[in-house]
């Protein structure tokens, strides 16, 4: 009896140590995820300032971080207004591209003929250069319309959402579908209980990738014409007038906008899949 009690206590202590070690490791990883990017950023900024202040790189080639911050503060109202315009274009394009990608992927997964017809179209859209498409759409929809930019963002968002969602729909094991059919489940029940839960991580991965592409495509579309006011057009105007520090300030705002979209999709992923601690990766399975 004493031996059994001792063994039980030893097992409990060992389990507590393992649990405590896992919790400590999790805390270290959480701290590292925050500290590592900050440390890298500080190192890059320090090297940047060193090149300008000590090495003597011209502001024409590389403005100093201090001058960029000064321009950022001085033109903050303009930066905020431009970020709202660009963010709206990117958001509209992201939503439209996501809806179109999800719908077409569902149809392609359901009917083989649609899959065969859509494959070359999606491949063609994926290789269309935004630099060539932006002036065309801006001219088609007029110099005062934002629709051309939103359409470009939608096309850029559509491809990753479609590809990842279609792959997710195809991950459902046939044995699971057969089992549901054996229980006389309807197509809607199979979709709700088997197909969608399996495909959800892939959908979210596609949306996360598309969020960054939507911002990039909106910026590029603004850079090549259309109504003024977005971050892309202000970068072009500032660079053309040799206000390079100001142009870099708009670039910093563009980076912040892209990060905001990315973090928003990460938050969406955490809300939709609260038990997942890591973002889903296209190259691997769910964790």
Regions found by a protein language model. Name each.
Residues 151-155, 188-221, 249:
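Transmembrane alpha-helices
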Residues 28, 32-54:
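N-terminal signal-anchor transmembrane alpha helix
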Residues 92-122:
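Transmembrane-helix boundary motif in ABC transporter permease subunits
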Residues 21-26, 54-95:
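Periplasmic/extracellular loop-to-transmembrane helix junction in inner-membrane transport proteins
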Residues 123-160, 167-168:
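Generic hydrophobic transmembrane alpha-helix motif, especially the helices
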Residues 1-29:
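Short, Lys/Arg-rich, polar N-terminal cytosolic tail immediately upstream
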Residues 164-203, 232-235:
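Short cytoplasmic-facing helical segments at TM-TM junctions of multi-pass membrane proteins
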Residues 112, 170, 248-287:
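C-terminal transmembrane helix and the adjacent membrane-cytosol boundary/short C-terminal tail
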